[in-house]
Amino acid sequence: MRSLAVLASFDFSFFFRVLWPPWNSPFLVAGGLVLLITLIAQTAGIILGFILALGRISKNPLFKKPVDFYLYVFRGTPLLLQILLMYEGLAELTGNPVILFPITHNAIVAGTLTLALNEAAYMTEIIRAGLQAVDPGQIDAARALGMRRQLVMFRIVVPQALRIIVPPTFNEYINMSKNTSLLSTIAVPELLDTAQSYYTQNFRVFESLAVAAVYYLIITSFLTAIQRQIEARFGERQEERVAGRPAPPWRRLLTGAGQRDESVTGTVPEGEVKL
């Protein structure tokens, strides 16, 4: 009976009026902002995470120790706290110099930067695990044949590591789209902030939040569909390798497959492995 009473009190006319048509709704703009922040923050997190992962697997303590400390801080503190520190605490700590104005005076920039820095800490471990999962014997063989370290990384290690890195990376894209809701605490006009603005004006709390939930579901469904397509493509690549079929020209160009490495010196007689 209570559930029926709750359902009866739900204002469907308000819900559908706000939800449709979407081009008349501020939620559409907020949803676009969520996608934009997600794309920028996650991509920046991947790039920074790759750099940090190289430091993480380095044997040089000058590279490894700072990365360990970075991961300790960003993985050990709440994301919401980091957002508040970046937007509100940084200005007080530094005296708000002009150079920090783009961060301390723009909530979108501060929020996106914090999300990227936080995500880099998690992408570091994902990328590190992928890089270290590649058979060390392949790396040793390539080095023994005279391939430069950079070529070994980008022609042998990275293409194989991507099969491990890509699935959790797209999960991180989906998580990032939901983490943008935390930016409502610093007045970034994303979906949750837009819903809060609506229900402070018309007092339809549940209906306003329900509209935001629908938009979040649309965004996560869209990202999930992309994830499945990319994972399917990686599955096809694996089948091609097993079947011995040649890779398409664009793929050979990206990975360097089938190209002669000029850094390799000497020849190896047939049936003999050069070590």
Predicted features along the sequence, with ranges:
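Transmembrane alpha-helices and adjacent helix-loop boundaries
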Residues: 1-275
